[in-house]
Amino acid sequence: DDVQQLCDLINSYKPDLVMNIALPYQDLTIMDACLACGVNYMDTANYEPENTDDPAWRAIYEKRCKEAGFSAYFDYSWQWAYKKKFEDAGLTALLGCGFDPGVTQAYCAYAAKHEFDTIDTIDILDCNGGDHGYAFATNFNPEINLREVSAPGSYMENGKWVEIPPMSIKREYNFDQVGQKDMYLLHHEEIESLGKNLPDV
């Protein structure tokens, strides 16, 4: 989490783009280093703090929860605040470029632009079709995964956030080639970015 160390590393390679696949705790530090080095930025997940009990962060978080209408620890506001800095520097910052978020938003934007006159509802269904042979295994960092599934779920309805207790809405879905899976409504960052960029849905 040292901007100068990151700058030294970036400057030693002189890339056009830094692809951040570190933990989301590092997002802002890496964005700061990219700005300092004049390098474009891309990540796969939005920022969240490592220490959610830090009083300074907690005060900002409580205010944001009231304004946004959801209480998950992760949201795009921290990174969207960098938009003007990157624009002024003539740089690009692509946020959430994994599968979800990432590909899911690209599919939705493409469908809205090329396939449909109107879209009333977007449901994003994501399942793990693999089997690691363990009773518990995640596709990414276990701590982040547990934070996601233990946070209140949320969805947007009529332009407003609706928050629900964690894993309180469940449905079954039969996926081609994977089979029937239990699905739970979770809060996830693509809901926030889709709500901002496709406001009529």
Give a label for each model feature.
Residues 4, 8, 77, 106, ...:
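Short, contiguous clusters of charged residues that form electrostatic/catalytic patches at enzyme active sites
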Residues 20, 98, 184:
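Active-site-adjacent beta-strand anchor residues
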Residues 24-27, 31-140:
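Glycine-/Pro-rich loop/turn segments that contact NAD(P) or position catalytic residues
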Residues 2-15, 22, 26:
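Conserved Rossmann-fold cofactor-binding substructure of NAD(P)-dependent oxidoreductases
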Residues 1, 20, 43:
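Acidic active-site catalytic centers that drive phospho-/nucleotidyl reactions
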Residues 113-201:
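C-terminal catalytic/substrate-binding lobe primarily of soluble NAD(P)-dependent oxidoreductases
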Residues 7, 31, 83, 152, ...:
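Short glycine-/small-residue-rich flexible loop motifs, especially phosphate/cofactor-binding loops
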Residues 10, 17, 41-44:
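Structured catalytic core of nucleotide-sugar glycosyltransferases
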